Amino acid sequence: MNLELIVDPLFRTPFLVGLIMSAVLPLLGNLLRLRDEWLAALGLAYLAGASGLIGLAVGIPAVLGAPLGALAGAIAKAFGQFRGNTVYAMMVLIGWAATMLVAANSVLGSAVGHALVEGQLYFAGTIHLAAAAVVGVLVVVGLPVLMPTLIRSRLLPGHEVSNRLKAWRWHFGFDVLAALGMAIGAGTIGLMAAFALAFVPPWAAFRISRNWRHCTLISAGIGVVAYIIAFALALSLDQPFGPVLVAVLVVSTGAAVMIRSY
């Protein structure tokens, strides 16, 4: 594993893009798991992939087109009064069908559809870095504001109703934040890699952490460390980044959870 490739000027921008997303997505995934909406990560990613592909078909970069589909899903979920993972399962099906149909009926071909699923991190440029940085700032600024309300809503579900609190704005705000995070993640590191970062580190953190602060640090730490290892491995072995990241996340966190359980 050649760590020098990480600081190579050719891969510096792609590395920074992925590094930001590797810290952001696990933080969003923590709250999705807390709300029992972990499938949201995959549903929003699929909608983002579909709208990103549609954007490419009309000449719009995927990283700009992807948020439109994810935001549409977040709005539909918020104002459609849907609860649980059912709506996100429908998003997966809709996004998958749209992606395959657009890929099959456009000049882009199925290769671009597969590229969106697997990720095109190595080709990330300034526009991708700017999008990732914006999402990173929104998460750093927004989560401390949204988190207390979201946690209280989960632990004390009757508090909002009994106190006549209009908490829908906080839930909708987080839905939008999660949609943006998954959209930029899907448009840069790939659909399945983005889902893995939002799902696997929080799963492990919930199993081994002592409190919420500990959970936050563990999930973000797992995401960042696994990303750095996967990035170096993928470049050194000339392998696609997305599958390598998923493999590193699953193997490392699975082993850590098993060791901790014993």
Task: Locate each region found by the language model.
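Small-residue-rich segments of transmembrane alpha-helices in multi-pass membrane proteins
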Residues: 45-57, 91-103, 123-124, 167-179, ...
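Membrane-helix/interface signature in polytopic inner-membrane proteins
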Residues: 141-174
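C-terminal binding/interaction regions
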Residues: 2-6, 114-122, 222-259
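Transmembrane helix-bundle core of multi-pass membrane transporters
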Residues: 11-12, 87-148
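Short loop segments and helix-boundary regions at transmembrane helix junctions
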Residues: 27-109, 205-217, 234-237, 260-262
